[in-house]
């Protein structure tokens, strides 16, 4: 995913499913300069920082 798309998802009024390594997540914020996203797992509530490219709108494992 590109950082611009991640920002669009954050700003969207509707729910858009996002996945990190096949785990559903919520994008908390995006840093466009560093190309990173602060995310929260919907399964565990664990918060982590990841490269935006590792996020997906479809439920597929990203390498």
UniProtKB/Swiss-Prot annotation:
Its main location: other. Keywords: Sporulation. It comes from the Bacteria. GO terms for cellular component: endospore-forming forespore. The keyword 4Fe-4S does not apply. The keyword Ligase does not apply. Pfam families: SspH. One of its GO terms (biological process) is asexual sporulation. It is found in: Spore core. Belongs to the SspH family. HAMAP family: SspH (MF_00667). This is Small, acid-soluble spore protein H 2. It comes from Clostridium botulinum (strain Hall / ATCC 3502 / NCTC 13319 / Type A).
């Amino acid at each position: 995913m590109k950082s611009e798309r991640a920002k669009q998802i954050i700003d969207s009024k509707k729910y858009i499913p996002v996945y990190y390594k096949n785990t559903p997540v919520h994008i908390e914020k995006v840093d466009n300069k560093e190309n990173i996203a602060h995310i929260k797992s919907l399964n565990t509530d664990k918060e982590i920082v990841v490269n935006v490219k590792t996020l997906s709108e479809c439920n597929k494992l990203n390498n």
